[in-house]
Amino acid sequence: MRWHAVYRRFVLGRHYRFAREALVPHFFDALTAYAMELARLGLPRADTAVTALQELRTLPLPSFTGEVEDVFFSIYSQLAEHWGEEVAGAIRRGLSRNDLDLTAFRAYLRDRVVALLGDFLRLRGAVLRVAGAHAGVPLVLRTHHRPAQPSTLDHYLLGVEALLERDFRRLQQTLDTLDRCPLGASALAGNPYPVDRRRLAALLGFAGPVENTLDAVASGDYALELASALAGLGTSLSRFLTDLLALAERGAFVVGEGLAQGSSFMPQKRNPVVLEHARIYAGQLVGGMGTLASLNHNTPFTDLNDHSTGVLEPLTALLGSAEAALELTRVALEESQFEPALLLEELSPEVLASEAVDLLVRKGVPLAEAYQRVQGALPGVRPELLGVEREELIAWMSLEGFFARREVLGGVGPKARAEAMARARKRLKEDRKTLAALRARVRLARRLLAKGPEGFQAEEGQKATDHQGQVEGQEHQEEPLG
């Protein structure tokens, strides 16, 4: 078939180049797993197709010429050319591009999300390391853009890390939907051959299949969930970066030499541009949600390009922006330094005025009256207008006293901060273990897939042996003693 030049340029060629660059390994994985399942069912030439696919994937895929419309038919035509039509046709029994494409898409996006979670963990680790290195360093925090109360740098950074941890959790939770395998759904009604869809999912390292076969090819919520999680991340990062830029503006945060740029005209300039670029990437994440929602909005619940091939390029761009935002923020933290003296630049008696109110209340003055008396003693919180000794007021309003009185859970007190740091480090360690287990599951599946049917059967046999040993061990433990 001769495709129109405009269609070739903007659709077929563009999609083929993207698939050739990003999706080919996932197509081969899905086709190999499917051929292995057909071979298990005893369908003719399926075992030969497994071998052919394993050999073919070592060769470069041809560039787009317009002779075939997509990567699947490029693989199919090569199979037919080198191994014959019967072998090529073997993998098409019951297989639709609907379930095949979405299996490859989900596997690709899953790998990208897993990699991004790793970047996320590195940033959280950097935040905690910088917080630990600046434990107890005081600074003045603001509310409504005005100086409010003292805190410490580690207390502030622990708050930022807590926000980022929730963003990490939301991104991690996208795998509950994304890490499910559509293969075996065929066009939409299910495969006409009795393939084991749970086995297919396991072969490809997925957590399990998308159960309903229409849902497997029709749903686009996996893309929406991912875009939503990335938008949340972009919002959180932009707030942190805005704070760092405000500190950099007054010299309290000095960006590392390799992350700042000068001016082509003003020789004195040393601009903290790494923070600006990180915030640009974070902003792109916020805008992505609208794009993905539009691609799903007002579309019928069935297989469509809108929420299959249509979401791949925008999601890929968003994942690239997320990686850039996380990594730029991380190196900005690791390669820059805070200036403690300038962090306290806004410290004044007024910043501790609430402590004077508390002191009067503790002496029996009604709160409303104490509040008015302190307001009347401003600026400077003059002790003679409060009816307290100067030395007592100075001691009460010291930073040390302020922090010591705030040993509540999550507070700025030294003990509370140390305990919060220990909890944050423990959560980070657990998240690293969880991510490592997920990576190991996918790596194992790919290793077994590369070995062919024998490798997967051997693994299943080992699992059965291990399970039997566990059962026997439990039975032995349950035997009555004596």
Model-derived regions, located:
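Charged, flexible cofactor/metal-binding loops and thiol motifs
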Residues: 105-121, 125, 132, 146-300, ...
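Helix N-cap/coil-helix junction residues
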Residues: 43-44, 206, 365
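A structural signal for small-residue-enriched, beta-sheet-centric alpha/beta enzyme cores
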Residues: 97, 210-214, 349, 357
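A general structural motif at alpha-helix termini
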Residues: 50-53, 204, 248, 257-259, ...
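Intrinsically disordered, low-complexity, charge-rich segments with an acidic bias
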Residues: 462-479
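Glycine-rich cofactor/substrate-binding loops
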Residues: 1-30, 64-68, 87, 251, ...
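A helix-coil-helix interface module used to build multimeric assemblies
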Residues: 1-180, 184-190, 195-197, 262-263, ...
